Amino acid sequence: MKEELTILRKFEHIEHCLKRNVEAHVSNGFEDVYFVHKSLPEIDKDEIDLTVEFLGRKFDYPIMITGMTGGTRREEIAGKINRTLAMAAEELNIPFGVGSQRAMIEKPETWESYYVRDVAPDIFLIGNLGAPQFGKNAKKRYSVKEVLYAIEKIEADAIAIHMNPLQESVQPEGDTTYAGVLEALAEIKSSINYPVIAKETGAGVSKEVAIELESVGIDAIDISGLGGTSWSAVEYYRAKDSEKRKIALKFWDWGIKTAISLAEVRWATNLPIIASGGMRDGVMMAKALAMGASLVGIALPVLRPAARGDVEGVVRIIRGYAEEIKNVMFLVGARNIRELRRVPLVITGFVREWLLQRIDLNSYLRSRFKH
């Protein structure tokens, strides 16, 4: 019964993301970040190079498709979405992450909805498991065994452990067993030979948490900040009674804005960062890269074409973002992503106010080029 509920929940999550407005009511903060226009770029636009390296692999664009779904039969919607996105990622040579594989652990016959190697043999594929399942008080506590199963069954190159305390706290059947997760992450990292990515799910990562994650050997952080898909909003639509809806509504806009989280994590650690959370155009993405992100992550913008099986629609959206990034780079005189991280930035408004209280802003602006 529990396993069936997990699968039903995954289906409901997809349905609400496709049919409802599940985005935060507040911005992700990048409107407070400005480039300084360069009237003499002293470069040719055609020479701009968008390639990046991440976890030992070279990619054609600084964009990845982050985990969204899985957990039904291959021919059903979750499998269709994953296969469509994987084929697009293969064509573009960018990383792709599947959604939570908990359903696959609990109901192994759903594994095919996550398997994409037959259509995307060369992509950098990232598996996905939830942090609360590694808590010391979890009912069915996961171990290194489940991590290796999640990776090897779908032939992934890395594993993301998603941190979603906000979603779990407002979910009627939520798992809030987070005690002991950091220790479990340390054990995972010391026991497997695959990169481990710590991934938020729309509420952002603080500098304190980032430092803890770096201390246990995590290889990269997907900050997934406030300003994009709100999983509290998704749970608001799933809730069956008014009290649970009231709680989910109250926390709809909880979290750390993406731009703020990015600056905090870049200032506090040396880890590669995936900047996701409301990334909806190439100008915003260029700002994130200039602020120190290694990659920009997207999910919701490509969900609808993926649900239709429209590979070229997904490719077209991402190439459009890439062209916008390239245009920004031309206008600030950056030949490549490394040079983009060294161009002047002006940070204003709420983002500046927050960062002045939380980090050494001038030091951060001088050290954005760590990766």
Curated annotation (Swiss-Prot):
Binding-site positions, FMN: T66, G67, M68, T69, S100, N128, K199, S224, T229, G278, M279, R280, A299, L300
A GO term from the CC aspect: cytoplasm
Entry keyword Magnesium: yes
Annotated positions binding Mg(2+): E168
Enzyme Commission number(s) of this protein: 5.3.3.2
Key words, A-Z: Cytoplasm, Flavoprotein, FMN, Isomerase, Isoprene biosynthesis, Magnesium, Metal-binding, NADP
Cofactor(s) annotated in UniProt: FMN; NADPH; Mg(2+)
Keyword hit for Cell membrane: no
Catalytic activity: isopentenyl diphosphate = dimethylallyl diphosphate
SMART domains: IMPDH
MF term (GO), any: oxidoreductase activity
BP GO terms, sorted: isoprenoid biosynthetic process
Localization in the cell: Cytoplasm
Residues that bind substrate: R9, K10, S100, Q101, R102, Q167
Top-level lineage group: Archaea
Primary subcellular site in the record, as a coarse category: cytoplasm
Function summary: Involved in the biosynthesis of isoprenoids. Catalyzes the 1,3-allylic rearrangement of the homoallylic substrate isopentenyl (IPP) to its allylic isomer, dimethylallyl diphosphate (DMAPP).
Family from the record: Belongs to the IPP isomerase type 2 family.
Subunit relationships: Homooctamer. Dimer of tetramers.
Entries under PANTHER family matching the protein: ISOPENTENYL-DIPHOSPHATE DELTA-ISOMERASE
Entry protein name: Isopentenyl-diphosphate delta-isomerase
Organism whose genome encodes this protein: Pyrococcus horikoshii (strain ATCC 700860 / DSM 12428 / JCM 9974 / NBRC 100139 / OT-3)
